[in-house]
Amino acid sequence: MSQPPFRLPRRQFLTKTAAFLAWSQGGLSPGDTPAWLWTGAVTAASATVLCGFERLRGPAPPLLLSTQRDLSAARTVEGRAVPAPSRSSAGRIVVEYALAGLASNREYFGGFTPGSGTLVRFRTFATGPFSFTAAFASCAGGTRLVPMSHVSNSRVFDAIAALDPHVFIHMGDLHYYNLIGAARPLEPLMGRFRRSLDRVLSQEHQALFYRRTPIVYMWDDHDFGPDEADHNSPTRDAARAYYATDVPHYPLPLGANADGPITQRFDIGRVRFLVTDARSERRPAERTLLGQQQFAWLLEELGRAAADRVPLVAWVNPVPWITADGDGNGWGMYAEERAALGRRITSLDLGSRLVMLSGDAHMLAFDDGRNNVNGGFVVAQSGPLDRFVRPKGGPYSHEPPDQKNGQFATLQVEDTGTVLTATLQGHRHLGSGRSVPVPETRLQLRCQGDRCELQPSRPESAAPAPAGTRG
């Protein structure tokens, strides 16, 4: 029997944080101050845990990893310390724990001493048929009390955690610092990116969420540089360098030398995820959003997915896809590149078994493919986590009559090995860490063999919104 989902209320979180600072039983040296911890790059047999220290006077402490919450029968995993100075802490260190040889489809717990208890929790995936839930959303940079603050401490993160997803896909605007500065020397801007991340991960509700839910994080403009930042932004190299050391991620096939896009590919069960970078290679003058190298990579990966006959492909594209040609939002200014991708998807007969997960627009809206003239696949816009409402793009076939702050979505997959059922569902935070499904944003695909079919959804008679109504 599987164990119940990991839960840690606020008071216990503060208690555990205090215990986290303990250095008894050989865990940490006196004066060390662990600040944050998050997990990513999860597979069926491995994961990566990163821990940030304001300073680390002794050697990197080993991580205790166990399948038990009390860390009994734990194995010891040594960490690799990487100097990562920030604007506010010259002695800041990030310790990477590369966890390998894990059992598939198993829940793991980690901490630094037996007395500290569980500080991180994740579940490995499985190869072959595997049922899971992935939550996805974007745009978190405000609170109810301070709407224009740079970071979020909203309880929307508690609401997502309550659904117990296997992974959270953050599609950009992790914060709204809109950093800018001289490109060289690199260190000052890198330090500012790291200080921004430290502030995000010091927010109570986000900190707790990322300790129990692995992340897949792709930046957008406000957390990559200033508003509408692209390849020409002086922040590009600093953002790329800090991402490599401070963010848990899957292999970066185009960025091995810290100079390419942070494009990633991974599988959860029989679902193939392709994550594209919409900022670091965007060149408006050349009318390319992906850049030549990333565009070629995506064409190749789409072909590989078709050849591998994966039942479902999830393309994480951080910006709106369904926009009018020439529209300044999302793909509108890159219509030729978008059309070429649409033709490739159509020629591979992938349209029925591809879903796009998108952010940037501060709205919750799905399209069943009827308004997607470039590929005809399902598109799911999800957000804002904690930001003002600002719709973009469209029309969309499935959209609520009103938009609110505190919105996110889930991709729930049930896979029998013969039939894979994928359900996209929008959710809205009600406050106090509770959420409700938004009935207008629900789509379900039934996939078997090389085809997926849309199932009757609510509302079945959803009509497209009038064209030309987006800002």
Predicted regions and their residues:
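Metal-dependent phosphoester/phosphodiester hydrolase catalytic core
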Residues: 4-471
